[in-house]
């Protein structure tokens, strides 16, 4: 069984041009969504509101299937890399963390970015 698993792993490690096309498309959509979200941010918005906007934006951009639930964290919540978005509001001076990704033809993007809102504390 271990030999079969190793062979499958090796075959999957090399991507065809078509597979690379799907991965690149997923990443480009993810980058587009994040640029859109950054422009829409405002003081007082909650992590949950932003996470929901991310989901809607992926659908709008042709990728309704997410790679995983979006992670949006503000302030002290950014210390938890697997934070689940909640009603925490964005405040001036907060650190913001996004971990988002989508799926295109079963190939996923996964992007994590950190920003500061206003002047960092």
Could you describe each region identified by the protein language model?
Residues 1-121:
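Active-site neighborhoods and metal-handling regions in enzymes and metal-associated proteins
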């Amino acid at each position: 069984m271990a030999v079969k698993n190793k062979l499958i792993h090796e075959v999957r490690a090399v991507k065809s041009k078509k597979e690379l096309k799907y991965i690149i498309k997923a990443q480009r959509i993810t980058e587009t969504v994040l640029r859109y979200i950054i422009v829409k941010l405002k003081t007082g918005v909650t992590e949950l509101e932003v996470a929901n906007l991310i989901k809607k934006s992926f659908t709008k951009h042709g990728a309704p299937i997410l790679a995983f639930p979006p992670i949006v964290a503000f302030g002290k919540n950014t210390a938890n890399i697997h934070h689940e978005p909640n009603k925490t509001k964005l405040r001036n001076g907060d650190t913001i963390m996004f971990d988002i990704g989508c799926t295109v033809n079963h190939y996923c993007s996964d992007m994590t970015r950190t920003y500061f809102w206003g002047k960092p504390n």
